Amino acid sequence: MTTLHILGFPRVGAKRELKFAQERYWRKELAEQDLLDLAKALREKNWLHQAQADADFVTVGDFTFYDHILDLQVATGAIPARFGFDSQTLSLDQYFQLARGNKEQFAIEMTKWFDTNYHYLVPEFQKNTTFKANPTHYVNQIREAKAAGHQVKPVIVGPLTFLWLGKEKGEAFNRFDLLKQLVPIYFEILTALAAEGVEWIQIDEPALALDLPQEWLAAYQDVYAQLAKVNAKLLLATYFGSVAEHADLLKALPVDGLHLDLVRAPEQLSAFEDYPKVLSAGVIDGRNIWRANLNRVLDVLEPLKAKFNQRLWIAPSCSLLHTPYDLAVETQLQQNNPELYRWLAFTLQKVAELQVLKQALNAGRDAVTEQLNDSQTAADARANSNVIHKAEVAQRLANLPANADKRQSPFAERIKLQNKWLNLPLLPTTNIGSFPQTLEIRHARAAFKKGELSLADYEAAMKKEIEFVVRKQEELDLDVLVHGEGERNDMVEYFGELLDGFAFTKFGWVQSYGSRCVKPPVIYGDVTRPEPMTVRWSQYAQSLTDKVMKGMLTGPVTILQWSFVRNDIPRSTVCKQIGVALSDEVLDLEKAGIKVIQIDEPAIREGLPLKRADWDAYLQWAGEAFRLSYMGVKDDTQIHTHMCYSEFNDILPAIAGLDADVITIETSRSDMELLTAFADFKYPNDIGPGVYDIHSPRVPTAGEIEHLLRKALKVIPKERLWVNPDCGLKTRGWKETIEQLQVMVEVTKKLRAELAE
């Protein structure tokens, strides 16, 4: 018989029940016991869904109140010493303080979990870190599930991935040196799990899909030789990429089974067809929301079944944490877009797909004819749908002129033309894009969406807000103005709602971090722009002032990265389609007299593949898609872009290759360190390093901004330097925003006068 198991389940519930309970608990509106009871009910529901789908085990240890890597920091005693907490007796309140900070200590840093849109809390390792086992989190969940009558498989992230994901703090050392102390602690934790009578323990080592240094790879053999002494079988799970280059290493490891991601890297299967133990085939996509073509999946699985027999397990490619909970609650989508609805599968539907596959492998395809026919019909409909495939989009991409993604003239010539009409002072000041969104604005948007506010009243509310934002900027004496983006709920969703080829769910939430969830748009078809999206707002804003108004768009790579993307054509093609659609908007803005246009790309870096060897291909198509978004603009139109993150050094040639006339970047928190990379690289175009951190309500002193600007002037010629905040101001309040910008403008004017002398 084929074994069915799940690597992990979403934690937040079908309608974000956990999120709302957590937030009520933090506001002291919910008792701790009530939060614990709700969490238990959610776990029981998750286990029941797995059991009802004929899973051979239910997975435990995957549920967390905030983050599974934070749970591991507690379980190994590796919580940051700076908090002064005892990991053995940690309270729920203290646990949340680690994640959210308190009056004395800032929160543990967050970063992206591999190349997903989930964030984990980065372990802080010090030279003198001492580990201490506390398996309570896992043991309690095992007991809970067993008490409910389930067969149980606990999951824990492995020691090498855990160490790799952390950062060294304090005195310089290599965190790899902590491995020999960490492994006995893992042994202690696994021994406690085995003592609960579990047959299998799943140990996740996704770091194997990265370019790990040789000494880290070499350590796997010894680490797992020690862990294999535990009185339970070990399933080593890899995902997010191919581990084929480590096939010899993995075959020799003393574990009892291996999980492979055959969705992200189907080609790696050939390297493991002689694997002598349990092979878990990750055949259902754990990171996207499309139904699988089950006949095609069986074409892969049936030969494996013949070869591996009882040793074949089936599973999703990775944890289902990255997919929404249940398609069945999307009644609105089912009514409005029944065709698209039939092509989708959320977590519960994916579990059901695995159940069908298990039945087919155990009893033959005839046992599930109806389900297989239904799957095939949906796949065929999707392949041939004219809702998805638009001949004119494919033609337009195929017939782009040879240098469609190149400006007419090089930057040195363009900037002269731009400066001539812009007539800006030295060190021009601007804002990144958004201004604070008041409750009033949010209410107006929501009421309009629900049909409670007429179009005329909605437009009046937005125009009133735009005028307010423009007047405030004039009072502050900023040089290049923005309209404030009051009409936008989210920088991707706003454009997705106005572009063809996108759809939206009502409950398609996935966890981003802690209680924060995001609802990505669904890109299901060829992308086009049926009509202008931003022109009237920017045009209205420009009509209110003689100062230069900047148009604001979200770039193609960011729209791609923050959406669920169709899987029937390459991501690169989808990205170029978005770029071409945006170019229509850019040209319409230009025609309307908006000749400074910003195309934001905060997500270009996070799209980088996990393996370095794949970077160039990605950066090439991502860069092309970005340049296509402004194709055809005149030389005297100034294109800006904005990026927010701290690591640029390794992709600077690609950033320069975007050929934006002005790039604004987040630099204040790193004390302008980032700029040295731009200077060493001799970055050729204009640059606006952020001079204060917008993530805090604190108003910077004149001295702080002056210090940063003087640092910037040391490495960037004054003629090419812009002055701006780090990021958009949407999440700030108006009071601190005005005060922050006042300081920024005053310091700029002081330095301007000095430079003029």
UniProtKB/Swiss-Prot annotation:
UniProt keyword terms in alphabetical order: Amino-acid biosynthesis, Metal-binding, Methionine biosynthesis, Methyltransferase, Repeat, Transferase, Zinc
Q: Which Gene Ontology MF annotations are present?
A: 5-methyltetrahydropteroyltriglutamate-homocysteine S-methyltransferase activity; zinc ion binding
- Residues annotated as binding L-homocysteine are 432-434, 485, 600
Keyword Transferase attached: yes
A Gene Ontology annotation in the biological process aspect, one of them, is: methylation
Residues noted as binding L-methionine in the record, renumbered to the chain: 432-434, 485, 600
The UniProt record lists the keyword Metal-binding = yes
Catalytically driven reaction(s): 5-methyltetrahydropteroyltri-L-glutamate + L-homocysteine = tetrahydropteroyltri-L-glutamate + L-methionine
Main enzyme class: transferase
Q: Which residues form a coiled coil?
A: none
Q: Name one Pfam family in it.
A: Meth_synt_2
List the active site.
Answer: 695 (proton donor)
User: Which HAMAP family does the UniProt record give?
Assistant: Meth_synth
UniProt family annotation: Belongs to the vitamin-B12 independent methionine synthase family.
Described function:
Catalyzes the transfer of a methyl group from 5-methyltetrahydrofolate to homocysteine resulting in methionine formation.
The name of this protein is 5-methyltetrahydropteroyltriglutamate--homocysteine methyltransferase
The protein's organism comes out as Actinobacillus pleuropneumoniae serotype 5b (strain L20)
Query: Which gene name belongs to this protein?
Result: metE
